[in-house]
Amino acid sequence: MAPAAASPPEVIRAAQKDEYYRGGLRSAAGGALHSLAGARKWLEWRKEVELLSDVAYFGLTTLAGYQTLGEEYVSIVRVDPSQTRVPSWLRRGVLVTLHAVLPYLLDKVLLPLEQELQADPDSGRPSQGSLVPGGRGCSGVRRWVRRHTATLTEQQRRALLRAAFVLRQGLACLQQLHVAWFYIHGVFYHLAKRLTGITYLRVRSLPGEDLRARVSYRLLGVVSLLHLVLSVGLRLYGFRQRQRARKEWRLHRGLSHRRGSLEERAVSRNPLCTLCLEERRHPTATPCGHLFCWECITAWCSSKAECPLCREKFPPQKLIYLRHYR
């Protein structure tokens, strides 16, 4: 009896199990870096640590020709488009590159590009979206982006910003569309596997598959498509709102620059953020009373829901943004 194709629940359980172990590896590597180099270096290099963790996980499993922990958990194996052979080393290498490395590279290029295009070209200050010193203009990618966007006109910057936004949001929507399509047809769960033609076969035979599960997944796929349409509309609306708010902010900042030099000197003496060790911008207070940059503390709380100084636990929604605070 020929091996049967893996069912959608098996593929999803394998992916969820892999995500669980990848998350544990990322957390352990990030914790080691934080303990050895401190919070500042952890914030600066956390994306690279996550990339190395993912490459290590898939390099020791997929690239080496073994099952991942998730695939072993549900007893499924990868096969090439012929459905009779294990994928070649080259095909597995392309799979790991598309699944783990390419998203990092796109984020590394598109995010600094959007931040530099959103920044005021007439101002010497770095963009507000940066989080840490390595992201505030010190990285090679940011310097390259800044050098090539410095000569653009305002109209060209707006057009390029729209293109970068459409590309980044379009990739996210494509991923959601692909998952919804999987719920309906149940073949490729990850976009990288579709591009490489890698599918799954069962290693062991199971009792007859419940047809109600198939129907439920198809219904979930339809709901996911409707949710995708709604989220695309909300993202476009939010982008237009941000564009309008950015214009108002630039007008307000242009008026504020006309104030006297005394106030300029007072602003320049703002205290430092203890996370990035730079002038504190958009001050935000934790429930325990410590102050940080809004960008720094929100990035910190995305992985550690505690104060970086006193280690008091608190949920991220308890952060207090201080308006007009000096």
Curated annotation (Swiss-Prot):
Q: Which GO terms describe its molecular function?
A: transferase activity; zinc ion binding
- Which residues are exposed on the Peroxisomal matrix face of the membrane? 1-7, 61-89, 186-216
Membrane-spanning regions, if any?
Answer: 8-37, 39-60, 90-122, 148-185, 217-236
Q: What does this protein do?
A: E3 ubiquitin-protein ligase component of a retrotranslocation channel required for peroxisome organization by mediating export of the PEX5 receptor from peroxisomes to the cytosol, thereby promoting PEX5 recycling. The retrotranslocation channel is composed of PEX2, PEX10 and PEX12; each subunit contributing transmembrane segments that coassemble into an open channel that specifically allows the passage of PEX5 through the peroxisomal membrane. PEX10 also regulates PEX5 recycling by acting as a E3 ubiquitin-protein ligase.
Q: Which family does this protein fall into?
A: Belongs to the pex2/pex10/pex12 family.
Query: What does the record note on quaternary structure?
Result: Component of the PEX2-PEX10-PEX12 retrotranslocation channel, composed of PEX2, PEX10 and PEX12. Interacts with PEX19.
Query: What's the protein here called?
Result: Peroxisome biogenesis factor 10
